[in-house]
């Protein structure tokens, strides 16, 4: 009985996804044809015939973070009253899409937190980051959202995020190649205690 219900639910889910993908592809087709007409390109030539479908598929994958919640991404949370030292995930590489120009920005994110009682696996931190990088973003908000999600889900004594990224909307449109933008978000002890901040920054340098 349970297997039959799961099969029905899965079929319904696949139908909804297929319908959503079809709508997205039609919208991509209209957008792409308009773009080609404005720049003087022929959208019906051989190399471009399947481009709208590829655009729809690519953006569906790159922006799938909206379908996930931070709690789901973190997965299993462990209760541990012993571990109260800083935990750091250093230089996690990421890619995201700038909401202003729909061009990529990419780089690495370092995550630090001091547990109170709750711990999560390192893979959970990576998945949490993907929830927010796989959305239309600006770097400042991305950095803050990861910090706020950690505070909300793990209730740590503090959290700090440092994000360093290159923006293709800047590099491709202006003469500023390979420039890096750095943002940070500090919560709890990291905001209140300069020694805690200094310890985290030293770990990133080592």
From Swiss-Prot:
Gene3D superfamilies: 1.10.286.10, 3.30.1130.10
Catalytic activity: GTP + H2O = 7,8-dihydroneopterin 3'-triphosphate + formate + H(+)
Keywords: GTP-binding, Hydrolase, Metal-binding, Nucleotide-binding, One-carbon metabolism, Zinc
Gene Ontology, cellular component aspect: cytoplasm
SUPFAM superfamilies assigned: Tetrahydrobiopterin biosynthesis enzymes-like
GO molecular function: GTP binding; GTP cyclohydrolase I activity; zinc ion binding
Biological pathway: Cofactor biosynthesis; 7,8-dihydroneopterin triphosphate biosynthesis; 7,8-dihydroneopterin triphosphate from GTP: step 1/1
Enzyme Commission number(s) from the entry: 3.5.4.16
UniProt record, GO biological process: one-carbon metabolic process; tetrahydrobiopterin biosynthetic process; tetrahydrofolate biosynthetic process
Binding sites annotated in the UniProt record for Zn(2+): 98, 101, 169
NCBIfam families the record matches: folE, PRK09347.1-2, PRK09347.1-3
Family: Belongs to the GTP cyclohydrolase I family.
Assembly: Toroid-shaped homodecamer, composed of two pentamers of five dimers.
Full protein name: GTP cyclohydrolase 1
Gene source species: Helicobacter hepaticus (strain ATCC 51449 / 3B1)
